[in-house]
Amino acid sequence: SGSRWGLKGTEDLGNVKVGFQLESGFNSDDGASAQGGRLFGRQATVSVSGAYGTVYAGRLGSVSSDMGSVGMLGGVSPFGSSFTDLGTHGSTGSAWARYDNAIAYASPMIAGFYANAMYSFKADSKSVKEVKAAENKPEATRYAAAGLGYKNGALDAVLVFDYTLYGNDTTHLGNGWSVILGGNYDFGVAKAFAKATYFDNQTDAEDVFHFPVDADSHKLFNLKGWGASLGASVPVFGGNFMAEVGYRDSEDVEYHNIDFKRWNTTVGYNYALSKRTSVYATGGWVQEKLDAAAKIKVNRVLVGGGLIHNF
């Protein structure tokens, strides 16, 4: 998990509650702010909640992620975005990110169903290309997403759709979108996870190895393709053993002769020292192949561990 600290508060006004959440990510090695140097880059929102749900405004994680107050993909894998390159986002093509200038809605649960939605008027206020762009104008990249979830006993399932309207000053062929179906089922002796995704013209798909194909940015591949993952979590020796395999197959929609294939395999163990403190260790192998005029294959083995304390 990424290092962070935050402030959170609510006030009950009778029929509604108003609140705020400020969450700051930082690099524990040198104390520098993460998320592009933002003080509260993980989340910075005000909210109003009542019987019909909660409305958020500010900066927060997308519906098509496991982050923040409206992210819906936390239950599709035992390894979320906090596991960085080993996380399940490596086998998706969704805009798994945080967005500035956003408004979002989270519904109450009704008969096991719930829904989240969001819209960003300007996705990244610190982007060099969009720093002067006016909010909700064609020169600004805008983002919309909606998801439907269902929880009933041991079943937890979600369906999420997102759509990115790229700013006019970018060089993309068209707008991007993705759809993700996933969830988990608790069998008691083990919990099984699964996810499938299809995406088109996405530029925020995880690119760990930064193949030097697009001169504008190491991450701006206009990707089209699909991905899937299977995982499990099993109680072992007082903790949880976790494992997942993920695959993504995609091509660059601008340069059709460029294909990307990626495998993720991850294992981990989490052990609770108390109700608020736990330790974890992870390890995995990631392979990404690029088939173009030059063929590149990169393999990487990653290991890590950490301590989590919830205040």
Per-region residue spans from a language model:
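Outer membrane beta-barrel
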Residues: S1-A123, A140, L148-D156
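Membrane-spanning beta-strands of outer-membrane beta-barrel proteins
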Residues: G2, L39-G41, R98, I110, ...
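Structural signature of outer-membrane beta-barrel channels/translocons
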Residues: K8-D12, S49-A51, A106-M109, G149-G153, ...
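Residue-level detector of the transmembrane beta-barrel scaffold of outer-membrane proteins
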Residues: K17-Q21, T54-Y56, Y114-N116, D156-V158, ...
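Outer-membrane beta-barrel pore domains and translocons
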Residues: E23-G25, L60-S64, M118-K122, K151, ...
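Outer-membrane beta-barrel domain signature
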Residues: D29-G36, H89-W96, S127-K137, G167-H172, ...
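Detector for outer-membrane/organellar transmembrane beta-barrel domains
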Residues: E139-T141, A145-T266, Y271
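Outer-membrane beta-barrel "beta-signal"
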Residues: V298-F311
